[in-house]
Amino acid sequence: MAASRLDFGEVETFLDRHPELFEDYLMRKGKQELVDKWLQRHSSGQGASDLRPALAGASSLAQSSARGSTGIGGGAGPQGSANSHPASGGGESAGVPLSPSWASGSRGDGNLQRRASQKELRKSFARSKAIHVNRTYDEQVTSRAQEPLSSVRRRALLRKASSLPPTTAHILSALLESRVNLPQYPPTAIDYKCHLKKHNERQFFLELVKDISNDLDLTSLSYKILIFVCLMVDADRCSLFLVEGAAAGKKTLVSKFFDVHAGTPLLPCSTTENSNEVQVPWGKGIIGYVGEHGETVNIPDAYQDRRFNDEIDKLTGYKTKSLLCMPIRNSDGEIIGVAQAINKVPEGAPFTEDDEKVMQMYLPFCGIAISNAQLFAASRKEYERSRALLEVVNDLFEEQTDLEKIVKKIMHRAQTLLKCERCSVLLLEDIESPVVKFTKSFELMSPKCSADAENSFKESVEKSSYSDWLINNSIAELVASTGLPVNVSDAYQDPRFDAEADQISGFHIRSVLCVPIWNSNHQIIGVAQVLNRLDGKPFDDADQRLFEAFVIFCGLGINNTIMYDQVKKSWAKQSVALDVLSYHATCSKAEVDKFKAANIPLVSELAIDDIHFDDFSLDVDAMITAALRMFMELGMVQKFKIDYETLCRWLLTVRKNYRMVLYHNWRHAFNVCQLMFAMLTTAGFQEILTEVEILAVIVGCLCHDLDHRGTNNAFQAKSDSALAQLYGTSATLEHHHFNHAVMILQSEGHNIFANLSSKEYSDLMQLLKQSILATDLTLYFERRTEFFELVSKGAYDWSITSHRDVFRSMLMTACDLGAVTKPWEISRQVAELVTSEFFEQGDRERSELKLTPSAIFDRNRKDELPRLQLEWIDSICMPLYQALVKVNAKLKPMLDSVAANRRKWEELHQKRLQVSAASPVPSSPSPAVAGEDRL
């Protein structure tokens, strides 16, 4: 098969589109000789010679470099070197062609300046080679060259991505980076403009207008205007003053470039903020007069005019003779600046009317250009401020756990945003108190004002400990008490400012901006204050609005951090309380030792395998031994390797965590477990359920009412209790019972499931949760329809997981309601206990919630108990046990007992009706008893 031929042009085009592949290949397999050749071709002869010590291994390059340097030193000069040709036989490396631009920049001795980029390139290449040298494998023998293109590109992209800081702050900064760039149009040369002025004044004027119309940078635009005005009127020097402070009503004329010559470069050599800045008060001097009145001033001799101020001349030694001053207006006719031309050339000549006319024609264009540049600068400033606010939000979301860190971030952002010398944050001790008292203060000084910015960050807990604090406390307290911002442009003129404290501190305060910090509930939690703008100007309205918006986010962040600290302390208190309670809620070692050494009676002796077991036959200790016997009889101790001492401790702790309520107590839990044990052993369900399922239902029976408070789910919802808030209104108590069971199991020395495998443990905990939640009658009503249908159709399949789940749920409910299946005396006694507990709940509903309880909870209607029991049996109990008998006929004694007990309740009900008929008493209709109200 013939190999495909590659076209070099196609390869080059592909590499142009994928430079990262070329870079990756060069970094992996590039040779030093290749880089030497590249440097030789793209550098001067002297530059190649300078590289010789670092690249001594490349002898051919050294020879060619020597020839190149000889030619330069031989007197050919820069011009000759630039036009020299390679020597014959030397190939590409024999001679080094020089660019004419190098000649113009050569030194007087004829030697050329070597480019700095060569040095940097050499360092970069050396670093990359060092990385390759330190590798412990040979890349030539790897299969990287055979990797597909997608793999190479993916690796290159990952390398790029890994070089970026993996923080949200850097990602946000990259996303918010402005994509708007200032247009760059190179102006025509000054010599060309001078030529046009002499030969074509119209074209000269158009060139000046065109050059300023394309510039949106106010600094370079101002510089251009000065130079062009000098050219137009033949002035020796020129100054431009722009109006500032108009919005605040305190106008000032400011010039960042003063006395610019016509022969200076078109771009300023210094861009330092406030460099060469001169401020002229509004209405003062000739500049101020022109700005205030908008008149043109043309003075042949400045010293003859009383408005002239010669202070600048005294400072600079420059003598002002003639002077032409003219206002600059925007499109609305407002004065936005003043242009001043000084000393007409030739020296001593005054400015003419033609000069005035030319300036009057040119300055309107300058006004338009300045307005556009100012608008662009304002939009950029607003963009930067909006970006800073977004970055503040990012900072606040990143740090919400440490108050000191978040306040420090806030102050750093405030200094960056407002460009101030000092920033402080004070937090109130008590936001509810009418007395303003600060409990914490944080302070940060700008690095420009402090040699060590980190050491300038201070925190003090007591107010007396920051007596050296430089912020005026009276202003901060005023803001905290009124909630209104305070902006002081001149601190020493404000009566609220303590000048004496300022002098003692050594930090001179000029201007103060202080705003309140609010939380989400619109309560003042502190104040934020900034001092002294770096440019020396007072804080303006824009600064105040920005600072107030900034502090809104800061207030939320500080409030969240304070709340987190409070929650953290509350959690610590809760942890301590739980530790104390768990100590008192667990059984003692003496109790464990007692039952560990006790002889456990047999099942026959305890009669716990009897479906008609007497619920009141055992005392509290006997119920523990009976529970131990059930675990041993079902083989769970041996099967799951349950430590016997742990089992004793767990049972005793479970008993201790049942409250002393009338019915839902430890005895009820044991009786439910006993009935489950009897059904498993008597009806043969032990053969149907797995060992894990049996363990789950037995443990579930013992734990299904842990920490029951004697009230039902409806009461928790009505009273909006802590349990309802924690678990919601669906199966509130059942979720609490399960979580309480888990807490006991996780306590030290109580995990009876410790020796189960991870899968068995996971399955068991899921089954345990299902078993406990199944005792909620709301869930019973939801699932019993499915169970009844499966039973009636004979479609029960024990291999189907959902069928087994429903069956276990029905078993749990049958055991929970099992008192109705016991002999009449036992069943009636249990019914009276349940009713008494319900009456206590009804009393609480009436007294605490101001509600009228339903019939089953109303003590005043206790004579209706037989009727309510009949409804209870007919609607809830009887259908369930009838279905279970269809599943297993061995459970028929339970159904028979239910029927027998119903007959007893029917007799009592009929007797009540007879008594009521003999002595009729008006009674309100009784409401239907909801199943969930029963348990």
UniProtKB/Swiss-Prot annotation:
It is found in: Cytoplasm, Cytosol. Inhibited by 3-isobutyl-1-methylxanthine (IBMX), zaprinast and dipyridamole. cGMP acts as an allosteric activator. It catalyses: 3',5'-cyclic GMP + H2O = GMP + H(+); 3',5'-cyclic AMP + H2O = AMP + H(+). Residues 54-69 have a biased composition (Low complexity). SMART domains: GAF, HDc. One of its GO terms (molecular function) is 3',5'-cyclic-AMP phosphodiesterase activity. GO terms for biological process: cAMP-mediated signaling; negative regulation of cAMP/PKA signal transduction; negative regulation of cGMP-mediated signaling. Residues 41-125, 915-935 are annotated as: Disordered. The tandem GAF domains bind cGMP, and regulate enzyme activity. The binding of cGMP stimulates enzyme activity. This is Dual 3',5'-cyclic-AMP and -GMP phosphodiesterase 11A. It comes from Rattus norvegicus (Rat). The lineage of its organism: Eukaryota, Metazoa, Chordata, Craniata, Vertebrata.
